[in-house]
UniProtKB/Swiss-Prot annotation:
Protein's name according to its UniProt entry: 5'-deoxynucleotidase YBR242W
Domain of life: Eukaryota
Annotated GO biological process: deoxyribonucleoside monophosphate catabolic process
PANTHER family: 5'-DEOXYNUCLEOTIDASE HDDC2
Enzyme Commission number(s): 3.1.3.89
Further information: Present with 2730 molecules/cell in log phase SD medium.
């Protein structure tokens, strides 16, 4: 393969990359740490190291929604991605290629290494968020990965697009498990903080889960959560 990665589907699944309106001056290159820029400016850059240094940002960026609730030592983006990937290995549905699920799970939030963890309450609109993520995945694949391994660049791009556009059963499962893992984490924080943090808005994601298997997991989680709060209320009123 020698062609530059120019997949025409945007992360919204319908807008061609060439037609995406650039609503701001934000560019992924502007978010790259200076020491990585210094490496890339060398006559013979170490592209693997540069890419890993960018991905490292996922390990130190904490999840915005939890920070907004005052959970200072909350999980990082990569914490979420790791457990999500583990959960995909547990899928029982025989139609599903679990290895493909793991690949998709590992890259689904990789653009957040430069974009950050933007939430619905942030002042950045959904269209702009998607544009930034699309520009970032193109930058990561074409500018950092492709010079070293063109096949890997295409595979990562394809896996990321599969998730964004939900073009396979595996992508659908990862979408659902992404929400399920978040709900598990929310319930863990609710127990840690003895119900003093309100995660009700997060549990609105239950309605958007599509696959029967993940629906079953989620139903069990919701029942456990309801019992926890019933028991907590009872202990307080005694």
């Amino acid at each position: 393969m020698t062609a530059t990665i120019t997949n025409k589907k945007s992360c919204s699944g319908s807008v061609e990359a060439g037609k995406t309106r650039l609503t701001t001056e934000w560019k992924p290159e502007s978010q790259v740490p200076q020491y990585v820029k210094n490496e890339l400016s060398k006559p013979h850059p170490n592209y693997i190291l540069a890419f890993l240094n960018v991905v490292q940002q996922l390990k130190i960026q904490r999840r915005t929604g939890y920070l907004d609730l005052g959970i200072k030592e909350c999980e990082s983006i990569s914490d979420h991605m790791y457990r999500l990937s583990i959960i995909t290995m547990l899928i029982k549905d025989s139609r599903v290629n679990r290895d493909k699920c793991v690949r998709i799970a590992l890259v689904h939030d990789i653009a957040e290494s430069l974009v950050g963890d933007i939430t619905p309450v942030d002042p950045i609109g959904k269209e702009e968020k998607h544009r930034r993520e699309w520009e970032t995945i193109k930058y990561l694949c074409n500018a950092l990965i492709k010079p070293y391994n063109e096949i890997a660049a295409k595979e990562i791009m394809d896996d990321w697009l599969a998730y964004e556009n939900v073009t396979s059963l595996e992508a659908r499962y990862v979408k659902d498990i992404d929400k399920y893992e978040m709900l598990v984490q929310c319930f863990e924080y609710e127990r840690e903080y003895k119900g003093t943090k309100n995660f009700d808005d997060f549990f609105g994601a239950v309605a958007s889960i599509k696959t029967d298997e993940v629906k079953g997991w989620t139903s069990d989680l919701v029942v456990q959560r309801q019992k926890y709060f019933a028991d907590l209320t009872q202990s307080i009123t005694k």
